[in-house]
Structures are given as C-alpha cells and as structure tokens.
C-alpha cells in the first residue's frame, strides 16, 4: 500500500492527487498545483491566461496550452477513481496508508504538544476548549462546533480528525520565498527547506532536492549517531569526573596525612634538638663548675703563698738593712734558708695553673646539621643508576654487573632485573612485561654476580634504585656470557699424537710412547684425531684454533657415537673443515664441498649455535666467513681435531665476537 500511495502522490504538493490533469507527456498533476505553476510564471499585473506553456515537474517536458489554458487539458478520471477507491479501502489510524505525510507530521506534533487548544469556530468569548482538530479543514473545533460543521455524511466523513493541536502545527512551516506555500521538499545543495515552486521556478530550480522524509531519515539517523556518541562521551566524562573527584578526595586525605606526618617529624626533630640542648648545656655547666672549682683552689693557694711570702719578705728586707756584720751573719743564714724554701714552694704551684683553660676551646659547630635541616623536603625516588659495562665481568655461566648511582644517600636498596636478549625489537615489549624478567631484590651493594646463566648468550640487565618514595630504573645494559671452556682429552688422542701438559695443544709425534687402549681413543691408521673433554647440548659457543704451521688437519664437531676409526666428516655423525696441503674442503657424511679461502687462515674460529642448528667456520684474524653447516642436531656434540703434521692449539671460553653476533645491537 505504501508503494501504491507513492504512485498516487502529486510531485508538487506531495499529497494524493486532487482533480488530476493528464499531461501530454503522460504524467499527472493536481489542477491547483498546475495553476500555481502558471501563477509563478506571471509577471506583475500579468493575467494567468497569458501563460501558454510550462514544464512538467517530473520529466521537464514543455507542455503547450491551448486558448482554454488548463481547462484544455484532459482530466485523469481513471487516476481520480483509483484515488477514491484507495481512500475508501484505507483503514484510518496512525499507520494507515491513506494518511498523508502531512497528517503523520501532525500526529507526531500532537504527541509532543501540551499546549491548550481553543475552538477556532466558536462565537463565544472566551472560546471553548477544542476536542478535535480537522486536518482537512486545518481548524480546531469544540464538541458543539464539531457536530455543527461535520455532520455524519459525505464529504465530511472523509475528513481526518485528530486530537487538538495548535494552529501553527496544523499549517506547518511556510516557505520563506513563497509565503502562501508550505515547505514540502529539501534543497540538498543549499541545505534548506523549500516549496515546490522554489524547485520549479525559483533559484533552487537546478539544485539537488530530496523528499522531506528522506532527509528526515538521514538527519535523524545522523543525529541519533551523534547523540549516541555524545552520550557515550558523557558517560566517559562522568567516569572521569568520578575518578577526578575520588582523586581530589585522595589528595585531601593524603595531604592531611602528610601535614600530620610533617608536624610529627618536626616535633620529633625539635624534641631531639631540645634533648641535645639539655645534654650539651649540662656538659657546659659541669665543665664550668669543675674549672671554677679548680681555679678557686688555685686562687686560695696563691693568696696563702703570697701572705706567707709577704712576712718573710719583710723580715728579709729588715735584715738587709742591718749594717753590723756580726748581727747580719747571725740572722742571715736562717732567713736565707726560709726565702729559698718559700721560693721553691711557690714554684710548685705554677704548673698547676692553666690560664688558657677558659672554655674558649669548647666550640659548638652545627653547620652540617644546619645544612641538613635546610635541605629538609619531600623524599623523592632516587635517580636512575648507571650500569658500568666496562667494569662488568663474565664467565661461561656467570655475569658480575657493576653500577653507580649519583644519589646513593637516598637509596634504600637495589633490584637487579635480567632476561635473554633476542634483538632490539623486543626491548620495549620486554621492558613493559614484568613476567619476562628474572628479578634479584634487596641488593645493598653496587654490584651483583648472577649465576647459572647460559653460555655464549646475550642478556639485558636493568638496575632499579628503590626508596620509600618509589623507584627508578637504569637504561638497559647488554652483557653476554663467554663460551663453554674446554680442553683436549688425552685419553681420546691417537697414539701418534702428543697432547701438551696444559691439554691445549696437540702435535704429530711419531716417537710417542705407546698408549693404552680406551673406548674414547682414535685408532684408525691416518685418523690422527683427538676430542675435547666436553659435550655440548645447548646454547651458542665460540672457540678458535691456532694453526702452528700445519698443512694437513681437520677441525670440526662429532657426536659421541661417531666412529673412532674414521676421519671426521666421513660419516653422518661428524662435520669438519679440512686442509690437505693446498686443498680446502668441508666434509660431512663423506660428501666434500671445496672452498677457496684467501688468504689461508692462520687461526680458524668455530661458532656453534646448537639450538638453531648451525656450525660455522671463520678466518678469525681477518673476520672472513668460510662455511656454515645447517643441521638439526639430535645429540650432544664434542669438538674434534685431526692433525697429520705440525700442531694445533685451541683457545676456548671466548665471548662471541660482535661481528658474529647476529642479535641486534642496543642503541
């Protein structure tokens, strides 16, 4: 029914056709709409009859009128009959297909309108409240006026009655350019409401237009989407607001707690200062009393000595005035002895007197404490430590990490974190993932030795400085363990080979003494081999072989199950780099591949990556790659060497050279 209704709708007024005219182009148009088109083409004071042509609003075909004007066009009786039957068959209601778009808009407005509507037909003053609004008449009626104006007979039975709504809602929005025309379409180009005449003869003639319902649906959907986003954003803001309020509360509580703590700590400092003041004051008083007591005793002794000396001085002076020799000699000896004794006794008192002990050396110096008090402030997290890679040391299974801190005074402890480094790309993810790190907590020194590490492996280390206020971490530092150290196993050496006392050098020795047979010993004629004393089953390892003038030798690796009576590389259990005079080959399972090193290596480096299945040979002095075996190792492997002339010396336990380390470097 909706599709049929759209076919019965006038393209100008967007209502069901009323008195439709059949145009020569086979389209239809309401008589009144056609008349409005002619009026819009008229100049001022020009009669409508002077217009003899107009364009079909549907196909733009030019319709030429006869002298009769619009009356000369045929009425589309068939279409009018279809419309009449359509209206009769339609069921009245808010979802009825007979409803016009205007009526649906009226219903929508009715639902939202709470204004008091008065009867527009009443002669009474004031008018009665309206009980119905006739959409067809565009008038609101009270019950009495409704019965008088809308008897239950045609054509009034076809009028649409709805709940009362204001007059402005009935009439709808009017066109700004054509005041008597209602807006019934939307100009997409200018983004504004227009009427049919605006599209036919106005400035919107060539603009893109759309039906109100289409634009309504689009804008409503857009508004709903924006509203949903706004509601979502408001919800997020409300959540944020709640967090901010909660944070403010926490700030208030924590600030109050810190203020109380500050008062408590300052009171404690004041208490300590007052206590120390009392203790030091007591010491001063005791020192003063002791010194004054001692000085008072010395003063009394001096006065007593002076009094005794004064009497003796008087007698001596009187004796000196005696001119009679006999009388003088009679008393002089006694007086002289007494003067000598008095002089000696006064001399004894002098060492006991210390005139410099006046408390001026009792100094009070609180400058250090004043500086500390002046520096009182919030405790902050310590500065990040710095890993000193140049001081760090490593073995094949340990690394000793050294670091420094310019803020050691505020550091309570350190925490060492480390993990295997697989490339620069994983540094950020590793730093953000606590599960990836091994952690050593509560370190008090500026160094720590980590044990049980994989040999020949690169690690990332970070050091965290910690105190009560928080912690800060150092920049990542890259350190690596050395390769697994090993020596030559004399029990495996061929009878015609001699192993040095330090088990690091092997040489051909025809005069070598007979050796007892062991399961590990190489036995074949010409297979003058010796094995290392270690079997490797994981990790990355690097060692070097010094070629001491030998021109016939083989260097490689072998499983424990490799036959001892065959040359290394002649079976599936061993891999070797061989030199036979000036011929160089790599050999595995009796398959030989020639290589041409230039210059001839004087030191060969071997890099074993057990986990990734590779055995690589290098010219160690010139950093030149010679060859790499790619193999899935299924058993532990042992370094193996064959010498036909001169000697070979091994250097083991080395770190993997940086130019051979394929992992990406830290910045």
UniProtKB/Swiss-Prot annotation:
This is E3 ubiquitin-protein ligase Midline-1. Has E3 ubiquitin ligase activity towards IGBP1, promoting its monoubiquitination, which results in deprotection of the catalytic subunit of protein phosphatase PP2A, and its subsequent degradation by polyubiquitination. Belongs to the TRIM/RBCC family. Residues 471-485 have a biased composition (Polar residues). Residues 499-520 have a biased composition (Basic and acidic residues). The modification Phosphoserine is found at residues 92, 96, 511. Its EC number is 2.3.2.27. Its main location: cytoplasm. GO terms for molecular function: enzyme binding; identical protein binding; microtubule binding; phosphoprotein binding; protein homodimerization activity; transferase activity; ubiquitin protein ligase binding; zinc ion binding. Homodimer or heterodimer with MID2. Interacts with IGBP1. The gene is Mid1. It is an enzyme of class 2 (transferase). It comes from Rattus norvegicus (Rat).
């Amino acid at each position: 029914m909706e599709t049929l209704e759209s076919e019965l709708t006038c393209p100008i007024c967007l209502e069901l056709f009323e008195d439709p005219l059949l145009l020569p182009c086979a389209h239809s148009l309401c008589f009144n709409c056609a008349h409005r088109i002619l009026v819009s083409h008229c100049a001022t004071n020009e009669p409508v009859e002077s217009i003899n042509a107009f364009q079909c609003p549907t196909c733009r075909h030019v319709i030429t009128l006869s002298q009769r004007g619009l009356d000369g066009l045929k009425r589309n009786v068939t279409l009018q009959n279809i419309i009449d039957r359509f209206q009769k068959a339609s069921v009245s209601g808010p979802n009825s297909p007979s409803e016009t778009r205007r009526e649906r808009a009226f219903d929508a407005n009715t639902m939202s309108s709470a204004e008091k509507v008065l009867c527009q037909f009443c002669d009474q003053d004031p008018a009665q409240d309206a009980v119905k609004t006739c959409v067809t008449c565009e008038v609101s009626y009270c019950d009495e006026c409704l019965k008088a104006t809308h008897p239950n007979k045609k054509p009034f039975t076809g009028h649409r009655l709805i709940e009362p709504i204001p007059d402005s809602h009935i009439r709808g929005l009017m066109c700004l350019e054509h005041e008597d025309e209602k807006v019934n379409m939307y100009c997409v180009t200018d983004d504004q409401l227009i009427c049919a005449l605006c599209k036919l003869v106005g400035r919107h003639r060539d603009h893109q237009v759309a039906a109100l319902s289409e634009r309504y649906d689009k804008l409503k959907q857009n508004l709903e989407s924006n509203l949903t986003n706004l509601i979502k954003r408001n919800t997020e803001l409300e959540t944020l607001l709640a967090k901010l309020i909660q944070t403010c509360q926490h700030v208030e509580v924590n600030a109050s707690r810190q203020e109380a703590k500050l008062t408590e700590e300052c009171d404690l400092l004041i208490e300590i200062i007052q206590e120390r003041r009392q203790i030091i004051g007591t010491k001063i008083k005791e020192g003063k009393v002791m010194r004054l007591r001692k000085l008072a005793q010395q003063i009394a002794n001096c006065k007593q000595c002076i009094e005794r000396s004064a009497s003796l001085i008087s007698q001596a002076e009187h004796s000196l005035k005696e001119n009679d020799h006999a009388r003088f000699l009679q008393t002089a000896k006694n007086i002289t002895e007494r003067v000598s004794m008095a002089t000696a006794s006064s001399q004894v008192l002098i060492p006991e007197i210390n005139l410099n002990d006046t408390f001026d050396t009792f100094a009070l110096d609180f400058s250090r404490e004043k500086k500390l008090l002046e520096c009182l402030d919030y405790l902050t997290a310590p500065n990040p430590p710095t890993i000193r890679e140049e001081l760090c040391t490593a073995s094949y299974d340990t690394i000793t990490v050294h670091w420094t801190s310019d803020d050691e005074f505020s550091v309570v402890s350190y925490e060492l974190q480390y993990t295997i480094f697989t490339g620069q790309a994983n540094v950020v993810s590793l730093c953000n993932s606590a599960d990836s790190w091994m952690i050593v907590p509560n370190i008090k020194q500026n160094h720590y030795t980590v044990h049980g590490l994989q040999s020949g492996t690169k690690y990332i280390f970070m050091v965290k400085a910690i105190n009560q206020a928080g912690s800060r971490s150092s920049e990542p530092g890259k350190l690596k363990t050395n390769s697994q150290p090993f020596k030559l196993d004399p029990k495996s050496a061929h009878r015609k080979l001699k192993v040095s006392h330090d088990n690091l050098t092997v040489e051909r020795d025809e005069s070598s003494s007979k050796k007892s047979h062991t399961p590990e010993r190489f036995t074949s004629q010409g297979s003058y081999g010796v094995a290392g004393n270690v079997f490797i089953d994981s990790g990355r390892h690097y060692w070097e072989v010094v070629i001491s003038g030998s021109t016939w030798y083989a260097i490689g690796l072998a499983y424990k199950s490799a036959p001892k009576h065959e040359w290394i590389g002649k079976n599936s259990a061993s891999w070797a780099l061989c030199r036979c005079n000036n011929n160089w080959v790599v050999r595995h399972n009796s398959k030989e591949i020639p290589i041409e090193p230039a210059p001839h290596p004087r030191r060969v480096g071997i890099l074993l990556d057990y986990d990734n299945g590779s055995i690589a040979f290098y010219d160690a002095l010139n950093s030149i790659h010679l060859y790499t075996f790619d193999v899935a190792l299924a058993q532990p492997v042992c370094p193996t060497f064959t010498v036909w002339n001169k000697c070979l010396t091994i250097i083991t336990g080395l770190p993997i050279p940086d130019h051979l380390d394929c992992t990406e470097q830290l910045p």
